[in-house]
């Protein structure tokens, strides 16, 4: 065989092996795609009791985050009402720690199906955020809602870092199940104690994107959005006290005593008994009303949660043992709605339809897990350094506050954000929706802060239409309306 023939034979063999490798890769990709498709379709929700008829798809179920410990997080995903493959994806987290994003975010605020007060069904939300984006609700950490672990020690190790690691693992595994959304613009949003969860998770996503040269491992994170969030302990607590005083919840004498006895420049505000005693007077006054919405009547039902918040255990423990603000008491326009939601998600047919249980061995679903709240280890005292880092990294950050929330009030948020010392890009001004002032907004270099006039802790439940306009502006990266005149 001459050299020319040998070279030609070698070329043919090389081409054959290359073609074989390509074929193997194609078969592998096809199998992976089929596995993803089957896993996704197994989570398709098709017969949810009381659900209004809709044209979009939604999925619910579990995503494992630690197979050796039997740990899995529950999610509920709603495709955008149109162009879901093109619209951004928003992950929503509620706070507590220990409260459910399914029970609050999805069913009382921004999801397409809201709890009906007849305790049996759902009603369509005309202001659902999936009009603008794909919405992914996650019950995090384990022990919240339907999320669980088969290893009891996991529940003893819950803290801020545990939560963010599991949430990141969830995202990686969820994108394997829904690969068609991997390239979508991705945002993380939440409220209350998610003010800690969200920046922590955003930083982890950002850092891993920076470390991974393989673009297939990247998550297309563009920014985060927070409502009435925990940000920085000293500033949050000082704002909590000042807001109660400025809204005539506490007396001048109580306000003076607290400022004299409590060191708000410390990471540990509760460093002496005298401070705790002074703070107890704020609790005493707030116990008479709905702290999450100062001007909404409190729920007077006989629910277990209502009884708990009236108990001596709650009043004694919620500051001294946890050193944090409590999870939500009775929020929303209808402060009894939490009880309706609990009835619905503990129905066998509902749990089976959502793939939360087999409909026989039921999960005991609650809107907030008080054991998680009281046993939580608070590792992070301030997320302001994360804000600075991610602003420098080019992420979009918007923060909003309902101005009638006494739990994490607008004043504390302003104190915290002012500590960043960011240059002002656009001066404080009103922003408008439907020809009315919705609130006020100030744009900083790298951050936008806005208020919602007349809204409590869960802003979308008070101001659904303007909240939808707000999320639309956020994902599009455009300023909030500066005029009463509507433009098309």
Swiss-Prot record:
Keywords: Carboxypeptidase, Disulfide bond, Glycoprotein, Hydrolase, Protease, Secreted, Signal. Glycans are attached at residues 150, 263, 364, 375. The keyword Disulfide bond applies. Disulfide bonds join 99-368, 262-275, 299-336. Its EC number is 3.4.16.-. Expression not detected. One of its GO terms (biological process) is proteolysis. The keyword Signal applies. PROSITE patterns: CARBOXYPEPT_SER_SER (PS00131). Pfam families: Peptidase_S10. It is an enzyme of class 3 (hydrolase). The active site is at 192, 405, 457. GO terms for molecular function: serine-type carboxypeptidase activity. Its main location: secreted. InterPro entries: AB_hydrolase_fold, Peptidase_S10, Ser_caboxypep_ser_AS. One of its GO terms (cellular component) is extracellular region. Residues 1-28 form the signal peptide. It comes from the Eukaryota. It is found in: Secreted. Probable carboxypeptidase. Belongs to the peptidase S10 family. This is Putative serine carboxypeptidase-like 30. It comes from Arabidopsis thaliana (Mouse-ear cress). The lineage of its organism: Eukaryota, Viridiplantae, Streptophyta, Embryophyta, Tracheophyta. The gene is SCPL30.
């Amino acid at each position: 065989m001459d050299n020319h023939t040998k070279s030609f034979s070698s070329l043919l063999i090389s081409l054959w092996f290359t073609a074989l490798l390509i074929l193997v890769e194609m078969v592998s990709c096809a199998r992976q795609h089929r596995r993803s498709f089957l896993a996704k379709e197994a989570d398709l929700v098709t017969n949810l009791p009381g659900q209004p008829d809709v044209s979009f798809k939604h999925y619910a179920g579990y995503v494992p985050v630690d197979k050796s410990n039997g740990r899995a997080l529950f999610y509920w995903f709603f495709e955008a009402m149109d162009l879901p493959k093109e619209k951004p994806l928003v992950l929503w987290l509620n706070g507590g720690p220990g409260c459910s994003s399914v029970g609050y975010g999805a069913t009382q605020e921004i999801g397409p199906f809201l709890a009906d007060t007849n305790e049996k069904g759902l009603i369509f939300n005309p202001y659902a955020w999936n009009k603008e984006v794909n919405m992914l609700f996650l019950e995090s950490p384990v022990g919240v809602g339907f999320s669980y672990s088969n290893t009891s020690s996991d529940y003893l190790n819950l803290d801020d870092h545990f939560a963010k690691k599991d949430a990141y693992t969830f995202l990686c595994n969820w994108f394997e199940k829904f690969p068609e959304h991997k390239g979508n613009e991705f945002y993380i949003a939440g409220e209350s104690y998610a003010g800690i969860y969200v920046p922590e998770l955003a930083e982890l996503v950002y850092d891993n994107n920076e470390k991974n040269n393989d673009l297939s491992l990247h998550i297309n994170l563009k920014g985060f959005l927070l409502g009435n969030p925990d940000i920085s302990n000293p500033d949050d607590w000082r704002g909590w006290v000042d807001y109660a005083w400025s809204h005539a919840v506490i007396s001048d004498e109580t306000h003076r005593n607290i400022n004299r006895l409590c060191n708000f420049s410390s990471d540990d505000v509760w460093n002496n008994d005298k401070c705790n005693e002074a703070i107890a007077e704020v609790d005493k006054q707030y116990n008479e009303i709905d702290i999450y919405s100062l001007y909404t009547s409190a729920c007077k039902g006989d629910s277990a949660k209502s009884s708990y918040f009236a108990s001596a255990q709650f009043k004694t423990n919620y500051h001294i043992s946890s050193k944090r603000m409590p999870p939500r008491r009775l929020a929303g326009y209808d402060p009894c709605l939490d009880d309706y939601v609990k009835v619905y998600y503990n129905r066998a047919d509902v749990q089976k339809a959502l793939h939360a249980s087999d409909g026989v061995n039921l999960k005991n679903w609650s809107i907030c897990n008080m054991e998680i709240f009281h046993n939580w280890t608070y590792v992070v005292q301030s997320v302001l350094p994360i804000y600075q880092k991610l602003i420098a990294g080019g992420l979009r950050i918007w923060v909003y506050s309902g101005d009638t929330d006494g739990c994490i009030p607008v004043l504390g948020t302003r104190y915290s954000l002012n500590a960043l010392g960011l240059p002002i890009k656009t001066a404080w001004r009103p922003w408008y929706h439907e020809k009315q002032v919705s609130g006020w907004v100030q744009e900083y270099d790298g951050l936008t802060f806005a208020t919602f006039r007349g809204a409590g802790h869960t802003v979308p439940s008070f101001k659904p239409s303007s909240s939808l306009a707000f999320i639309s502006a956020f994902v599009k990266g455009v300023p909030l309306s500066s005029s009463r005149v509507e433009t098309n």
